[in-house]
């Protein structure tokens, strides 16, 4: 009888790597799906759904990501200031100009399942507007998702 081996937390921590992706010209949804799979560890042979076995990801040039269709005009993001009448509405065009890092971060977060483990996974994503970042010490490997 064949025994199934499960990945332990210590083994997963030893195998973590840092990756960097240039988001310039990439479609937002496709970028978010690939990023979510990478930080979950679904690209690994020893993927275990109940363990945090994913890698770290740095996304640069988030201000050059592409929104397809009419999402720039017809899609809105809402937040509330907790005061009466304090609902704020931001269009895709404004979100891409002012808070593109938050736009990409929320897209990746939306591709993850809603559980306790996803709160640990989302901490592995680091999004930057330009091509400069402060993660050089980790020596990230470049991924080409174009």
Swiss-Prot record:
GO terms for cellular component: cytosolic large ribosomal subunit. Disulfide bonds: none annotated. Keywords: Ribonucleoprotein, Ribosomal protein. Pfam families: Ribosomal_L13. The keyword Plastid does not apply. SUPFAM superfamilies: Ribosomal protein L13 (SSF52161). This is Large ribosomal subunit protein uL13. It comes from Mycoplasma pneumoniae (strain ATCC 29342 / M129 / Subtype 1) (Mycoplasmoides pneumoniae). The gene is rplM.
């Amino acid at each position: 009888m064949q025994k199934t081996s499960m990945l332990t937390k210590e083994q997963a921590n030893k195998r973590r790597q840092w990756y960097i992706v240039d988001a310039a010209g990439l479609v937002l949804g496709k970028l978010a799906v690939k990023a979510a799979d990478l930080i979950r560890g679904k690209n690994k042979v020893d993927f275990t759904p109940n363990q945090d076995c994913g890698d770290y990801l740095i996304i640069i040039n988030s201000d050059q990501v592409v929104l397809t269709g009419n999402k720039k005009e017809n899609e809105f993001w809402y937040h509330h200031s907790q005061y009466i009448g304090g609902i704020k509405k931001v269009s895709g065009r404004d979100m891409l100009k002012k808070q593109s890092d938050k736009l990409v971060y929320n897209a990746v977060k939306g591709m993850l399942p809603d559980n306790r483990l996803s709160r640990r996974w989302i901490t592995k994503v680091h999004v930057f507007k330009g091509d400069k970042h402060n993660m050089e010490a980790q020596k990230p490997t470049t991924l080409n998702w174009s």
